[in-house]
Amino acid sequence: MTSDWDEIKRLASDFQKAQLTTSLQRLSERNCVEVVSLLIEKGLLEVIYTTDGKEYLTQVHLKQEVRDEMFVRGGRVNLVDLSKALTVDFEKVQVVAEQIVVEDRSVKFILGQLIEQFYMERVASEINEKLAQVGEINVADLTVQYDLPADFILNNIILRHLNKTIMGKQDSSNANIFFTQSYVARSKAKVRGALAAITKPTPVSAILAQCGIPDRLFNLLVNEVATLGSVTSRTPGALYIPHIYTKTQVEWVQNFYRQNGYLEHDSVAGLGVTDVKNFIVNQLPNEKIVHLKKCSVGEKLIEQVASSLEECISTSTYLDVSTVLPSIMSDEDVDQLLTIVLTAPMQKQVLIFNSTILTTKFVEDMIKPCYDIAVENAKKSVDSGTYQQYMAEKMMKHQDVIPDKESAENKADKRDERRKKAAGGKAGGGAQGRETKTKSTKKHARGHRGNVSDSDEDFGPAEKSAGGKKGAKEASIELITVKDISKVLHGGLEEEGLEDLAKQLAQHYYPQFSRLALAKAHELYEISLHQNNQNRRQTHANLQDKLNNLFNDIRLYEKGIKLLPADVQPQLVKYLLKSLGTDFCNEIFFYVAAECNLNSNGTTLTVEQRNKIAADCGQEYRGALQALNKATASSAAVDDFLVVAENSLQACSMILKKIDKKKDRNLILCHKHGLLEQLANCSDPALVLHLAVLILFTISTQSMLHASGRHVSAILSFLQPALAPEQAQTLTTYHDLVLKLLSVENASDDSKADADEVKQQLEKLTPTVKDIAGNYKKAGLTSAE
């Protein structure tokens, strides 16, 4: 019983123990969380939560897991990847990583990565294998391959394992490049072989492409192996020039120069020479070389040209330099060479046209006839007035340059001066007054022109152009042409086969002969001007008298017109101004045109021609001429015409004589005698009637009358009271017969018999009409006075 009870107690104790043990192992998750939280609160436990919050890690355990991951991943792990794999926050992992780096110096922390020492040893082994295969390796390439900084690879991997794991040599010029000695030996052999096979200048780039080595290594090795040539530079465009090629260049240049005395630049450049001129000088140090554009020549060739030129000058002939010089020389080369050879005295004795040299003596013998042509043409230009027109255009062109204000003031002063002199002339006598005015006019029209002709512009290039207007080209004249000179030269040059130079030579001599012709024309012009000036005073006086006579005639005719009925006067005034007024106007305009050297061909002028002269003449004439032309064309009142006519005379420096009634009576008497003389010699019935009526009017009124045939009827009606009845009847009958004759003559041929009958009647009455006019005496009418 007791043993059973003990057994029961033992079993109960075991059971209780079992119960207690089982309860400890089966704590619920909630209980565990509470227990851990309690430990953390009391500071007895430090844990790290996973990102999902389901697990706890201690710092030591996390450090161990990081190391395990580094080992699993081959000694290199990224903290970002590590954070994801361990499901731990990145900052916690970074803190642990920094602790590992501090505790273990063999571990490196680079760019967010942990790298073990054995990983770096493995990379060093791989680099060594690649270096052995390729022969050369660049840290930059390794940086791309391993995704590590260049400094880290260079300092922590390559240099630390150089000549241990990595068997190679660092480049002295570039610390990032490593190569093996065998690679250098192979490359040197390639370079040596390539350079030995080259016989002409070859680009270094072509050599590198053929050998398959980098230019850096080539530049390193070329000085060691280039015993048969040289490299021009270390730039990408460098050339390798073999010594054999340089030797061939030098021999070719020396031999060619020795045989020909010159070297063509293109030929030397074709040998591969870049600086041709310096190369020639270096290869021919003892020669006096002259560099031209396309070639370089030696002293021997220059002396040959000089001797040929001296012979040409001494014999007064010509020389074609192309026969002495090489054919490859351009015109510019020839010019440069001749500039060197020709001395100052020689240059005065020759003319150069491309490659042909003519002596001046040779040309002057052929060109002598041109002097006669120039003189002859100059004389013709003066005789025809062409040179005078040129001088006028030139003078007007220069006058246009003067400012308007200054020009107006000068002209006003001159006009005042002329008026003062005109007043002085009237006081001292007509002849003296005219002389004073003539001198003033001469000074205005000729003096400035002489100054213009003395300028150098007279001898400029000749080309016809219109002058005298603003904006026009400079006035010029061509007295001798290039064609004239060329024609003279062509004959002499053709004999020598140089006719192609005729035009060029003519163009060369053209300015000289143009100046000669202009100078001769000016000389002849001055002579003719002097001769013309001697007659100018008398011509001016004659024109003044003529215009005074016309002026007085118009004035006296106006008095006669005023005696007629008012309805007849306008027609007679119009006829008077259209005839005598136009004559007066034309004389004034012809005079001004001559003074201003304007074109005024013909004996009469139309209204348009007079307008053009008024527009082109000097300012001192323009206003008066325009008013005169307007008054003449409008045929208004005679008084208005006489006013503008007097103004035009003053503008032309002419004096209007005072009215003298005694002279007026003499003029009327002379006019009557003139009409009687015409009547005595006249046989035409219409003209007989016209003259008879005018004579009767002059005698009966003691006034002159200027009328046309259409006004005969009106005048005859006016004279009826002054005639005897039989005289009036005779004149009326004669007048009717004249009208009948004119109408019959304009009719058909059937009226021919009537015309003959009328003519017979007129022939019978004509002596009677002439007798009436010739013997008529004033009876009962007061005179015009």
From Swiss-Prot:
The keyword Glycoprotein does not apply. E3 UFM1-protein ligase that mediates ufmylation of target proteins. One of its GO terms (molecular function) is UFM1 ligase activity. It holds the Pfam family UFL1. GO terms for biological process: protein K69-linked ufmylation; regulation of proteasomal ubiquitin-dependent protein catabolic process; response to endoplasmic reticulum stress. GO terms for cellular component: endoplasmic reticulum membrane. This is E3 UFM1-protein ligase 1 homolog. Residues 396-473 are annotated as: Disordered. Residues 439-449 have a biased composition (Basic residues). InterPro entries: Ufl1, Ufl1-like_C, Ufl1_dom, Ufl1_N. Residues 396-416 have a biased composition (Basic and acidic residues). Belongs to the UFL1 family. Keywords: Transferase, Ubl conjugation pathway. Its EC number is 2.3.2.-.
